[in-house]
């Protein structure tokens, strides 16, 4: 089963211009969904992504990517 990343295009702490290429570098074949994830509270203050339906967040995008790499299949 392929990995799936879900990210929000409206949350303040998520910069899609930098995050999407980095997620694609982790798994170029992963499915990526962009849209509201109903994760607005944490999304205001921390970078986040859902990886295979599991929410991951971190104070910085670099820290988030470290967590993402541990969760991909």
Curated annotation (Swiss-Prot):
Pfam families in alphabetical order: DUF1450
Homology family: Belongs to the UPF0741 family.
Official protein name in the record: UPF0741 protein BPUM_3395
Species of the source: Bacillus pumilus (strain SAFR-032)
């Amino acid at each position: 089963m392929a990995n799936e990343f879900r990210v929000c295009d409206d949350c303040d702490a998520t910069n899609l211009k930098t995050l999407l290429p980095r997620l694609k570098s982790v798994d170029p074949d992963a499915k990526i969904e962009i849209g509201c994830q109903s994760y607005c509270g944490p999304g205001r203050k921390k970078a986040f992504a859902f990886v295979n339906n599991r929410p991951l967040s971190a104070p910085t995008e670099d820290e988030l990517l470290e967590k993402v790499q541990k969760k991909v299949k």
